[in-house]
Amino acid sequence: MAVVLSACLLLLSACNSGNGESMVADGAIVVTDIRGKEVRLSEPADRVIVLYQGALDGMYMLHAEHTVVGIQNNIYTNPVSFKYFSKLDPRIARKELPAPGNWETSTNIESILALKPDLVIIASGQTDAIRLLEDLGIQVFAVSPQNNAQLFEEIESIGKLTGTSERAKELLAYTRAKLDEIREATKHIEHKKSVYYAWSGGRIYATSGQNSRMNECFELAGVRNACTFAIDQPNINPETLISWDPDLILLWSTNPQELYNKKELSVLKAVKNKNVHVLEPPFFYDPHTLKIMYAAIELHNVCYGENENFDLVENRREIMTNLYGAKATALLE
């Protein structure tokens, strides 16, 4: 990870700025992040840097975008992300929001400090950056939800940290009710179709195991994860995929032709029958956000087309409107 170590020279001034835990008064806002670490603020954050796309998405759902003063660079460099986040925030459309890092590769500590954040939201895997920021007295809320329970805790905690707790309650109440509705519609399926999920960018042999967000999506959709491994992100070989022989192959930001070009996979029934589906545009299906419910709805319809339970157009409109409010109109254009 390319972290700018020269930022350590700013340690003394940052520690004296009052951001440290020792300066927090009684009655502070206290939440626990994915690491199990307490994050404390004396009042709701006015200046937040968000370096994790799922959490940035959540900020707009929470109507907390007015607190965002920095984002991850990937929002600008990924054409699909830029297209939709531009619709959520004119500052992104004009490329005015500073981008001091990426969610998984690099973080510029000096640029973060220059923005004088009250809070930095960052992927828990960025351990070096987190350590430096916390050593410099910056409050860090680490994220990387692996299931709905953790995602709900993340939304609730960020709501508290940004003064949008009531909106967080609204979001979670709607989401829980919608998830119950989806489960009720899919629970009758006895013979579940098997689905293999391939990671983005043509990584056909990188998949999601039983302990993953996509597996949770599969269960909600009433399908079975073809991957039998208990781990989150296994890498497999062609022989293993052939032995699983899934009914459908689900792709993310990958051209199906990349799959069809792999001659060794021509024996798969999903390939023979062209049962390959791409969730696109990916913005509407991000499993690291509350939009996992829409991904499940579409996957269910794709797998059980003869007995569709959901109107995709109506559900997209309903879900996005409840998640984003008035901003959903621009997203759905």
Model-predicted regions and their roles:
Residues 16-18:
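Bacterial signal peptide processing site
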Residues 34-36, 94-109, 146, 230-238:
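Short helix-initiation/N-cap motifs at beta->coil->alpha
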Residues 11-14:
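C-terminal motif of bacterial Sec signal peptides marking the signal peptidase cleavage site
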Residues 24, 29-37, 42-81:
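Extracytoplasmic strand-loop-helix segments at the start of, or within, the mature domains
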Residues 206-233:
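Alpha-helical, coiled-coil/dimerization segments enriched in small aliphatic residues
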Residues 28-31, 128-204, 227-229, 278-333:
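Extracytoplasmic substrate-binding proteins
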Residues 97, 103, 108-122, 138, ...:
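Proline-aspartate-enriched helix->loop->beta-strand connector
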Residues 56-111, 119:
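A short, structured surface patch at a secondary-structure boundary
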